[in-house]
Amino acid sequence: MNKKEFFTGAVKQVFIIPVKIYQYSISPLLPGACRYTPTCSEYCVQAIEKYGPLKGIWLGTKRICSCNPWGGSGYDPVP
């Protein structure tokens, strides 16, 4: 692993860790309300892993904004 790969992986983890904290500490206390599969938080993690922090957060934000009664639902994987 070279320095660039290490740095990229570390930056991704900086953005993934807060989502994982949410998934394991806050999400279990709330009723299941996500209309999509995978859940919006898991979608965000997958998007960050696949595209990096900037595009991953953008895709995750768009997904969270569409997760409402007037938005979509069902299976929606990271593009």
UniProtKB/Swiss-Prot annotation:
> Does this UniProt record's set of keywords contain Lipoprotein?
no
Record GO cellular component, one term: plasma membrane
Pfam entry (one): YidD
How does the protein associate with the membrane? Answer: Peripheral membrane protein
- Domain of life of the source: Bacteria
Q: Which UniProt keywords apply?
A: Cell inner membrane, Cell membrane, Membrane
* Annotated InterPro entries: Membr_insert_effic_factor_YidD
Q: Where in the cell is it found?
A: Cell inner membrane
**The keyword Heme appears for this protein:** no
Positions the record marks as coiled coil are: none
Role, per record: Could be involved in insertion of integral membrane proteins into the membrane.
Q: Which PANTHER family match?
A: MEMBRANE PROTEIN INSERTION EFFICIENCY FACTOR-RELATED (PTHR33383:SF1)
Q: Which family does it belong to?
A: Belongs to the UPF0161 family.
Q: Which HAMAP family match?
A: UPF0161_YidD
NCBIfam families assigned to the protein according to its UniProt record, in alphabetical order: membrane protein insertion efficiency factor YidD
Q: Would you tell me the protein name for this molecule?
A: Putative membrane protein insertion efficiency factor
What lineage does UniProt assign to this protein's organism?
Bacteria, Pseudomonadati, Bacteroidota, Cytophagia, Cytophagales
